């Protein structure tokens, strides 16, 4: 077994900075990989709201007030501080510059410049920080897409690019030309395309999404490039932190419960109803949703179908909405006003309320237009909250349709992105809820599902092995079946497909235990 040095580069990492599911991946996967014997570290921007915590909470500030690295990047000075991811032993590098000072992660007129600067700083750091030099830089989404393009000139550093959401592709080439120097052979349209083109290996966060993005419907204009990537594009399903998301010990619940004793869910449901002004009734079908108010999450479909469903049933609905579009927020508020005592809307991400929704609601709604993976449905099932989802992306890989006559399935699914199909699915779930024994069996099947990060981490190690040509797994498990891939078209061979040197000489052989 060999120990590799792997640097995760991302815009978010839970629990320090979180907007979407990428933060959960970056905050959880390195912890598991370190347990499997790898030297994994994280690098991310030092946002203004993190500065405010320095000196207040142990583990959330640099070990030294002086930067460990300071150099010119894109004509500006970048400083890097060393810290540790709170609650773990994962080393954390924080890139400091005044452009990250505002108390935000995304948006703003300088968003493209900020993350291009961050990507350049990561590349320079990997090249020049001699106390620790990574063998692989694991990049996440468009914010780090330029790193594989720059690092391809370094044959001793491999790159992995993970696509969390193909819809967000970053600055286009003409914008990049104004911000930074580009090599003459750069041929990607934007930073997302650059990451896909130049990375040694590319993966998405679910097998189904890896197949979907090779088609015009989901490819966002990059389907030909993704199809050309062939076997170097794969889907690895995300996991969840099963220690953090454990209904037996979760401190944010009114009452804890387990797969063997679900009685605590009734107390959580009553607390949730009372807290949000809903009619307290244990026999009412209570649906929950935790999502950003954007089209991707199916908010337009939700407005069409749920408004009528609440009119014609005794069901209740709770929505915890994060950042999103003002239009959808206005429509949701109007719905809540039309259904007093039956619908509640809370704005902004509230972790404690989210946990109470998972632990108290009967069903969890995810009518997504597209969903690269989705974390919420896995958390919901772990808490006995039955998911109602549209079959797309990672929802296909994690939720199976309930067939009462056969006693199989973990949730309710519909295919077409149409209000009638969603309404019908809601009605079927509501009807099944009336049969308590059947519903409880459905809950327990979901709770028994294995969504731990361990299996996913082994898949990532297999992918790293393909880059390093060295064994990283403690024991060689059987290889998974080959995932479907498209044959590369006959194109001029770009520099991104040139073979690398065999192995990394700096790696040290670890003694077998």
Swiss-Prot record:
Segments carrying the region annotation (Disordered) are 475-513
Its biological purpose is as follows: Synthesizes alpha-1,4-glucan chains using ADP-glucose.
Q: What keywords are assigned to this protein?
A: Glycogen biosynthesis, Glycosyltransferase, Transferase
A molecular function (GO) term:
alpha-1,4-glucan glucosyltransferase (UDP-glucose donor) activity
> Residue ranges under compositional bias (Low complexity)?
488-497
What the entry lists under Pfam families is as follows:
Glyco_transf_5, Glycos_transf_1
What is the E.C. number? 2.4.1.21
The residues listed in the UniProt record as binding ADP-alpha-D-glucose, with positions renumbered to this chain, are: 18
Which HAMAP family does the entry link to? Glycogen_synth
* Enzymatic reactions: [(1->4)-alpha-D-glucosyl](n) + ADP-alpha-D-glucose = [(1->4)-alpha-D-glucosyl](n+1) + ADP + H(+)
Q: In which pathway does it act?
A: Glycan biosynthesis; glycogen biosynthesis
Homology family: Belongs to the glycosyltransferase 1 family. Bacterial/plant glycogen synthase subfamily.
Its BP terms in the Gene Ontology are:
glycogen biosynthetic process
What's the protein name?
Glycogen synthase 2
């Amino acid at each position: 077994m060999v120990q590799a040095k792997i640097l995760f580069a991302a815009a978010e990492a839970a629990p320090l900075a979180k907007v979407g599911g990428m933060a959960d991946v970056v905050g959880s996967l390195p912890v598991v990989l370190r347990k499997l014997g790898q030297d994994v570290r994280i690098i991310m921007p030092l946002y203004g709201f993190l500065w405010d915590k320095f000196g207040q909470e142990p583990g959330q500030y640099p070990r030294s007030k002086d930067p460990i690295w300071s150099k010119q990047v894109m004509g500006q000075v970048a400083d890097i501080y060393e810290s540790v991811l709170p609650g773990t032993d994962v080393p954390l590098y924080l890139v400091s510059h005044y452009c990250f000072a505002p108390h935000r992660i995304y948006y703003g007129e300088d968003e493209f410049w900020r993350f291009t600067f961050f990507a350049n700083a990561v590349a320079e750091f990997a090249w020049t920080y001699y106390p620790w030099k990574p063998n692989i830089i694991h990049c996440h989404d468009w914010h780090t897409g330029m790193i594989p393009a720059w690092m391809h000139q370094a044959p001793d550093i491999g790159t992995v690019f993970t696509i969390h959401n193909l819809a967000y592709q970053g600055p286009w080439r003409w914008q990049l030309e104004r911000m930074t120097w580009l090599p003459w052979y750069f041929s990607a349209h934007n930073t997302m395309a650059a990451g896909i083109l130049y990375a040694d290996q590319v993966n998405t966060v679910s097998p189904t999404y890896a197949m979907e993005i090779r088609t015009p419907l989901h490819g966002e204009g990059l389907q030909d490039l993704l199809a050309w990537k062939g076997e170097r594009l794969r889907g690895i399903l995300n996991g969840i932190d099963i220690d953090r998301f454990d209904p037996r010990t979760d401190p944010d619940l009114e009452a804890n419960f387990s797969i063997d004793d679900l009685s605590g869910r009734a107390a959580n449901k009553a607390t949730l109803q009372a807290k949000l002004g809903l009619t307290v009734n244990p026999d009412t079908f209570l649906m929950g949703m935790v999502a950003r108010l954007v089209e991707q999450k199916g908010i337009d479909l939700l407005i069409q179908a749920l408004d009528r469903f609440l009119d014609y049933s005794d069901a209740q609905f709770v929505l915890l909405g994060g950042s999103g579009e003002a239009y959808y927020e206005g429509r949701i508020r109007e719905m809540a006003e039309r259904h007093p005592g039956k619908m509640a809307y809370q704005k902004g991400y509230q972790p404690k309320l989210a946990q109470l929704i998972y632990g108290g609601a009967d069903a969890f709604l995810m009518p997504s237009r597209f969903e690269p993976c989705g974390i919420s449905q896995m958390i919901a099932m772990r808490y006995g909250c039955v998911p109602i989802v549209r079959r797309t992306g990672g929802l296909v890989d994690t939720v199976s349709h309930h067939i009462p006559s056969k006693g199989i399935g973990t949730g309710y699914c519909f295919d077409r992105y149409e209000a009638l199909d969603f309404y019908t699915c809601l009605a079927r779930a509501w009807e099944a809820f009336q049969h308590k024994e059947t519903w409880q069996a459905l809950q327990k099947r979901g709770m028994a599902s294995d969504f731990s990060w361990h299996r996913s981490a082994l898949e990532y190690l297999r992918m790293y092995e393909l880059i390093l040509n060295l064994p990283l797994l403690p024991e060689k498990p059987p290889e998974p079946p080959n995932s479907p891939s498209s044959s590369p078209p006959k194109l001029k061979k770009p520099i991104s497909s040139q073979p690398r040197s065999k192995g990394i000489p700096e790696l040290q052989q670890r003694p077998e235990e």
